[in-house]
Amino acid sequence: MEKPTSSTNGEKRKSPCDSNSKNDEMQETPNRDLVLEPSLKKMKTSEYSTVLVLCYRKTKKIHSNQLENDQS
């Protein structure tokens, strides 16, 4: 059997890709959770949504008195 060299000390070395991907996953997950939590809490606290209905009339309403005056 081979003896472990002094550089490895008998431990398996991880490839840079494996260690980077694990570190990235660990770092990204808490950041995403922190960003999503406040928006979810806001949605839970609002029970009812507000609906606004606006009516806009382009022409003015003409009174019957004005019609009589215009015709004469």
UniProtKB/Swiss-Prot annotation:
Biased composition (Basic and acidic residues): 10-35
Domain of life assignment: Eukaryota
Record Pfam families: SPAN-X
Signal peptide: none
Region entry Disordered, spans: 1-40
Family: Belongs to the SPAN-X family.
Name of the protein: Sperm protein associated with the nucleus on the X chromosome N5
